[in-house]
Amino acid sequence: MEGSKASSSTMQVSFVCQRCSQPLKLDTSFKILDRVTIQELTAPLLTTAQAKPGETQEEEANSGEEPFIETRQDGVSRRFIPPARMMSTESANSFTLIGEASDGGTMENLSRRLKVTGDLFDIMSGQTDVDHPLCEECTDTLLDQLDTQLNVTENECQNYKRCLEILEQMNEDDSEQLQRELKELALEEERLIQELEDVEKNRKVVAENLEKVQAEAERLDQEEAQYQREYSEFKRQQLELDDELKSVENQVRYAQIQLDKLKKTNVFNATFHIWHSGQFGTINNFRLGRLPSVPVEWNEINAAWGQTVLLLHALANKMGLKFQRYRLVPYGNHSYLESLTDKSKELPLYCSGGLRFFWDNKFDHAMVAFLDCVQQFKEEVEKGETRFCLPYRMDVEKGKIEDTGGSGGSYSIKTQFNSEEQWTKALKFMLTNLKWGLAWVSSQFYNK
């Protein structure tokens, strides 16, 4: 019973392939190791390298023991031991087997045997660059590689042999020829070295010149960049000046066009537009007159009289005419005439209507005085232009205007004892005479 227990608790230690890490089943020759075999395997190692004293004494102490054979038992646990090169020497060659105390002899023999097997693999690994143990397939692969290496080595050996034979067959003449060639090659080498030194010197000179040229090129690049910036600035200023010049030229051209238009423009016609609207004569769109059917506001009539006074005043100034007996005072819709004989007397050319309009005759006196000024203008024009003639003859003493080219009747410019129709027609004829006078002045003084 105890033997069975001891047998079931025994641990088997196995090895793995150092290339593919597959578990190995060792050959039976590793299980039977005698003293002679151990000495044969360890002899090369002891002659080439110094063995550790402890290991030698341990092997000599255990060399007289009887060989043993490992038997596999059911229920035995197995443990893989890592390769010896990946562990220290002490740990690689030390094994601890756990079992019953009563089976101490068997455990000691197994431990010694495994230690010896591990040492053998260490010896094999130390002799080559390959770690041991190896499985059969890895061993075959290794052998193929070694065969290939052997063939290469043999080929090299053959080549060396042939070279040696050629050298041995060479005579003294060939040796002298080779010596001459060697001297020539040495001279050639010296010449080439000298040329190389000259080239190196030239290279240094060229490098220095290149640095100078690069510095000069950099300076020129900077100057070029500066010139480019200055050119761009000048170009920008030129474009701005060109734009300003074109703008000024356009302004001058526009001003010239406007000047030409102004030269061709009749200032009096542009300023004083005399026309008619039905039975009314108009000046600058202000109606001068009044009808029962069209009761024009007195503000509009006063404004029309103001424009009429301004027109006659401008024509007289253009001709250098000074009126006798009266002086025109253009004052908008409150224009009037001053009597030159009585400075305190003013004749208003404006009216507000009402009852006072029918009893106050100053407005009528002012209109008759204005008609007198128009007659003086006509007479002044006739002095220099005998053919000048107004379309409607004026009778200043009666204060009437005759329709010489039409019905032949005369119409009073006064409002008292007169109808609005006749008064309006008289004012229309007066504006027509002023329009003719304006046209004559424009033709005579257009270029002055």
UniProtKB/Swiss-Prot annotation:
It is a peripheral membrane protein. Residues 423-448 are annotated as: Required for membrane-association. The modification N-acetylmethionine is found at M1. Its main location: cytoplasm. Keywords: Acetylation, Antiviral defense, Apoptosis, Autophagy, Cell cycle, Cell division, Coiled coil, Cytoplasm, Cytoplasmic vesicle, Endocytosis, Endoplasmic reticulum, Endosome, Golgi apparatus, Isopeptide bond, Membrane, Mitochondrion, Nucleus, Phosphoprotein, Ubl conjugation. Belongs to the beclin family. It is found in: Cytoplasm; Golgi apparatus, trans-Golgi network membrane; Endosome membrane; Endoplasmic reticulum membrane. The keyword Transmembrane does not apply. This is Beclin-1. Residues 140-268 form a coiled coil. The modification Phosphoserine is found at S14, S29, S88, S91, S94. A motif (BH3) lies at residues 106-125. Gene3D superfamilies: 6.10.250.3110, Autophagy protein 6/Beclin 1 (1.10.418.40). The gene is Becn1. Residues 243-448 are annotated as: Evolutionary conserved domain (ECD). It comes from the Eukaryota. Pfam families: APG6, APG6_N, BH3. Expanded poly-Gln tracts inhibit ATXN3-BECN1 interaction, decrease BECN1 levels and impair starvation-induced autophagy. The modification Phosphothreonine is found at T117. Disruption phenotype: Death early in embryogenesis. Embryos show a severely altered autophagic response, whereas their apoptotic response to serum withdrawal or UV light is normal. Accelerated neurodegeneration (conditional knockout in cerebellar Purkinje cells). There is a cross-link at K400, K435 (Glycyl lysine isopeptide (Lys-Gly) (interchain with G-Cter in ubiquitin)). The keyword Nucleus applies.
